[in-house]
Amino acid sequence: MTAIAMPMPSANRAERHFYLAMAIAVVVAVLLGFARTVFLRPWFTEYAHLHAPVETWFYVHGTFFLLWIALFATQTSLMTVGKPALHRRLGALGAALIPVMLFFGTVGALIAARRPTGFFDVADPPLQFLAKPLPDMVVFAVLAGGAIAWRGAPQTHKRLMLLA
């Protein structure tokens, strides 16, 4: 009795489509998660008290973090369509973006903790509030840094990038 083996290109294609689907899911989650408080804030009356100007810092922070999400989706798309050379060139932008995100994420968390209403009306005490974003920055640094360190090992690299 002979076993029928699945051809490798098919398995590889399925894996690439899995990561593309995950990247799309991340984009959708970010858009839905921030729709009421950021992207569509003027249309949600329960957030009317948040229509006051938000510190520029948070817009800059959000821009860099959205850039990371867009870059992640682009990078995944490039590998799905078989463009690894462009993926590697854009990877340098991602590597440069990591310390910028760590800086803006950490300082943004510290600024939000000082606000009387917290960050978008999450009025937790400052130390309690910081228990979420500061460890998030450490985990992101470890995962993204690990992904860069293991970029020569595609299976490890792609998993770390997805988790970052």
Feature map (PLM): residue ranges:
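Structural signal for the C-terminal ends of transmembrane alpha-helices
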Residues: 74-82, 144-152
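Membrane-interface helix termini and inter-helical loops of multi-pass transporters
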Residues: 39-49, 114-124
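Alpha-helical transmembrane segments of multi-pass membrane proteins
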Residues: 26-43
